Amino acid sequence: MIKSVTLRSFHLPIEFNDTKFVSRPCFLARSFPVVRCSSTRDVPKLELFSRGKFDRILQDPPLIEKAESELSDYCSTLEGDDSYSCWRAYFELKDLEREKPKVEVENLILQTGGLKSLIGCLHGVASMEKDNKTKNGLHVGEESDREKGMNLHIHIPDGLPKSEQELEEEEKSKMPDSAFTRLLRSKGTIPAWFSHAPDHETD
């Protein structure tokens, strides 16, 4: 930017020499222009104080992304249990973003007053969601087990002799008796807690 400024000459001009000052006779007053240059290239541009909603949406990152970024930066400054709790809240926020609608997550972030309150709020919401999933999972599991039991239950009568195939399978599944086991069977006495099989079950 170029500006033009007019300066007037002195009535008594003074000339400077190495040895003495010499004053010249008075000249007539006359004016001459002086050119001055000023540049505004290095001056930073300030943002407008009143930005529109559309401008903020275009320039600012989404609320959830901004909260995640601030939370990760805050967690990087912590140590120990505080750092663990902060990072757990960060991943809980990620889980909420996947499972819940975007509006609900944004309302949750707006309702909190800061990062510390956001961490506590995320822990509370995550614990409630975990309890609900556990209860619902147990309920569904019990119902499914009951239905499976009703569908797959087959009545097996007791007291019937085993078939030859079942007896062969039992004999094959048994481990071979050691010499000590055979000695106990032949010489040992029956303990008090042992009872013989009823007569109708013996062949």
Curated annotation (Swiss-Prot):
Keyword set, alphabetical order: Cytoplasm, Nucleus
Name the UniProt record assigns to this protein: CCG-binding protein 1
Disruption outcome: Disrupted function of the female gametophyte. Defective in micropylar pollen tube guidance leading to zygotic lethality.
Gene Ontology biological-process entries: cellular response to hypoxia; defense response to fungus; embryo development ending in seed dormancy; pollen tube guidance
Any one Gene Ontology molecular-function term assigned to this protein's record: mediator complex binding
Basic and acidic residues bias (residue ranges): 161-175
Location in or out of the cell: Nucleus; Cytoplasm
UniProt xrefs under InterPro entries: CBP1 (IPR037502)
Task of the protein: Required for the development of the one-cell zygote and endosperm in embryos. Required for micropylar pollen tube guidance, but has no effect on ovule development and gametophytic cell fate specification. May connect transcription factors and the Pol II machinery to regulate pollen tube attraction, via its interactions with AGAMOUS-like (AGL) transcription factors, MEE14/CCG and the Mediator complex.
Record organism: Arabidopsis thaliana (Mouse-ear cress)
Region named Disordered: 156-178
